[in-house]
Amino acid sequence: MQAALKLQSDDARPLQILIVDDHPVVAEGWGRIIRTKTACEIASAPSASEGWRAWRQARPDLMVVDLSIGRNKIAGIRLIERLRRVDPDLPILVFTMHRSPVLARRALMFGANGIINKDSPPAEICAAFTEVARGGNYVDSRLAMQIALLNVSRPGTSAPRLTGREEEILGMITEGMSYRDIADRACISYKTVSNVSLVLKDKLGAANLADLVVKGIRYFEGD
């Protein structure tokens, strides 16, 4: 209880925490773990948009945000980016089932204070929560090493060559847009988007759409 209590007011009101996750069971489970660490009141939101509205209404002391919400693989990152524009000091802890250092690094770049896997043991979850609650940062050592290795140049490797159209569509895919939304924005057919996506997966060596998002981010970051 020691560190998290620093966020409480002088009248010792419970810590206000907002968990944004589309799986109620996960939010409830994390809530139980956090309650073992400090006196707190926990609210939850099942989507990024509802998380934004809940933040505006409640102005919590700390937020726990799922990296991927629903089918949008980077919805959590977009929410963090939006929050940081208006509240640069809000402690934000990201939890995720993805073990991608690329997505983890992106979450940290956009303002997350910490990131942890959903299946981490309770003791590690409490450690991450405590550190972020006191205003610090938390990334487990293995993931931190993987993030650091992203900056190591790899001799003999070069980025795949993409056409202008392929880059345009890849950019929208990495933003978490659906094929239908991409088709509408680019004024092309859904089938064209689907076909280009297949080409992109082949060129970037992506196994599926989630992997394409990760490799797309790396492509634009120049890794």
Swiss-Prot record:
Signal peptide coordinates: none
Pfam families to which the protein is assigned, alphabetical: GerE (PF00196), Response_reg (PF00072)
GO molecular function: DNA binding
Alphabetical keyword list: Cytoplasm, DNA-binding, Methanol utilization, Phosphoprotein, Transcription, Transcription regulation, Two-component regulatory system
DNA-binding region (UniProt annotation): 179-198
Keyword rRNA-binding applies: no
Function comment: Member of the two-component regulatory system MoxY/MoxX probably involved in the regulation of the methanol dehydrogenase expression.
UniProt protein name: Methanol utilization control regulatory protein MoxX
Species in which this protein is naturally found: Paracoccus denitrificans
Gene label: moxX
